[in-house]
UniProtKB/Swiss-Prot annotation:
It comes from the Eukaryota. It holds the Pfam family Conotoxin. The presence of a 'disulfide through disulfide knot' structurally defines this protein as a knottin. The cysteine framework is VI/VII (C-C-CC-C-C). Keywords: Cleavage on pair of basic residues, Disulfide bond, Knottin, Neurotoxin, Secreted, Signal, Toxin. Residues 20-38 form a propeptide. It comes from Conus tessulatus. This is Conotoxin TsMEKL-P012. It is found in: Secreted. GO terms for molecular function: ion channel inhibitor activity; toxin activity. GO terms for cellular component: extracellular region. Expressed by the venom duct. Belongs to the conotoxin O2 superfamily.
Length: 78
């Protein structure tokens, strides 16, 4: 009977430890996600650094424009 009690306690400790480890990993992933999102630049920053084209500039695809919309080979206003 004592062996069974010890085994049950050991199993409970292992399950608890596993749950704590998984919880810690989840917090790390949340921080990574927040860091990824905070690294994004605003439209104004992208335009200022020349990473996208402003309104009425020649374009061939949507990602080239700060507004994200290339229509009839020119960037839309927004």
């Amino acid at each position: 009977m004592e062996k069974l009690t010890i085994l049950l306690l050991l199993a409970a400790v292992l399950v608890l430890a596993q749950a704590l480890i998984k919880k810690g990993g989840g917090e790390k992933r949340q921080k990574e996600k927040i860091n990824f999102l905070s690294k994004r630049k605003t439209t104004a920053e992208s335009w200022w650094e020349g990473e996208c084209s402003g309104w009425s500039v020649y374009c061939t695809s949507d990602p080239e424009c700060c507004s994200g919309e290339c229509s009839s080979y020119y960037c839309e206003l927004w």
